[in-house]
Every structure is written in C-alpha cells, then in structure tokens.
C-alpha cells in the first residue's frame, strides 16, 4: 500500500483560496526501463494550401545501463478512427539518458482546429524493442495555423480574430479546488455565450 498525505498547516493562508489538500488525480506509473518520457510526445503543425505537415517529437527515457536500439511508430487517426498517416523510425537511445527523435507526417486535406469546430486528431505512439511493444502513448492534436502581425493583429487559419479573454483561478468558489467537470461545462458554455474565446488559467494547475 502506498499512502499520499498532504500537510498544509505550516502555510494555510494565501492571497487567494488555495483549496489545500490533494485536488488533482494521483497516479502510480510503472514503466519498462525503456519508455516514453513523461509528457514526452509533442507535435508541431505547418499548414499548407491543401495539406499539413505534422511533426511528432518523441522523447525516450533509457534507464538501462547500455545503449539500446528501439523502433518508434506513430499513427495519426481522425475523429472517426481512420488512419490518415503513419510512420516508423529506428534509432539508438543512450544508456541512462533521454534521447529524442522527430517524425514528419503529411496530412492531406486536413480538418483544421478552430474556435467553432475544435477538431482533434489522435496520435498513437508506440515504442518497440525486439519486436515487442514496451510503451504506448496517445496524444490529442489540433491542426491549426497561428499568425501574429504588427499591423493586422492575430489570425487563426488566416482568419482575423480578436482575442477576448478572461482570467480564472483554479478553484470554483464554495465548491473548492477539486472542480467537478459539470462546473467547467457550465462555465465554458456561459463564457462562450458572452463572446469569450480565450482563458488565462491562474495561478495554480487546474483540477483534472
């Protein structure tokens, strides 16, 4: 048994309501000595006229005492679960270090993420060693084009857009810091209804 305890008695006051205690999920992660680093899959997008390039970056943590060769597989699924592209790369991860690789995948006729249609793809990353999967990760990905111009301002997917935002602390008032998802659903619906399209999350991490 593993017990996690939080003691906030030494610093129980603040300029804002902290919520104290554990208000986010707690996970115990058991991983293979060769595994995807925590938050180790990221991506960048480059939108063209009728296509987009999705650059997937993967960090592999090798806790073994020797260099090892691994295979990294990336598959991109659309919202309906159809594979739109995939790729494989073999590289060597150094002993007791984090090594990274990049893979570029072309997406034809991509559905772009926008405020009114937040379309998301899913990147499934698998790491194999000697033909066996040693780790797997799923990452939601939105393909969009962001541009900033000193004269024209901000544009999303080449469409001018005014950023109309609010600042929200991590708590939900009398409901505490462990905010139920239903509260966020109501908040976001209300904010969008008054024209809000951006949120600054402060100051602490939000509850999951």
What are these model-predicted stretches?
Residues 1-208:
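Secreted/periplasmic carbohydrate-active enzymes, especially glycoside hydrolases
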């Amino acid at each position: 048994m593993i017990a996690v305890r939080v003691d906030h008695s030494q610093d129980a006051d603040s300029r804002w309501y902290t919520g104290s205690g554990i208000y986010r999920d707690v996970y115990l992660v058991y991983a293979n000595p060769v595994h995807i680093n925590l938050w180790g899959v990221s991506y960048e997008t480059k939108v063209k006229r009728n296509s987009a390039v999705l650059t997937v970056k993967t960090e592999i943590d090798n806790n073994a005492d020797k260099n090892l060769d691994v295979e990294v597989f990336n598959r991109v699924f659309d919202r309906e679960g159809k594979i739109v592209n995939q790729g494989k790369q073999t590289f060597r991860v150094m002993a007791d270090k984090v090594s990274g690789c990049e893979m570029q995948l072309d997406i034809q006729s991509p559905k772009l993420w926008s405020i009114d249609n937040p379309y998301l793809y899913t990147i499934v990353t698998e790491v194999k060693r000697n033909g066996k999967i040693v780790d797997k990760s799923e990452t939601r990905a939105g393909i969009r084009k962001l541009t900033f111009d000193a004269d024209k301002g901000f544009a999303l997917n080449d469409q001018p857009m005014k950023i109309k935002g609010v600042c929200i602390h991590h708590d939900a008032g009398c409901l505490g810091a462990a905010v139920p998802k239903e509260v966020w659903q109501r908040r976001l619906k209300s904010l969008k209804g008054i024209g809000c399209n951006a949120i600054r999350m402060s100051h602490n991490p939000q509850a999951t």
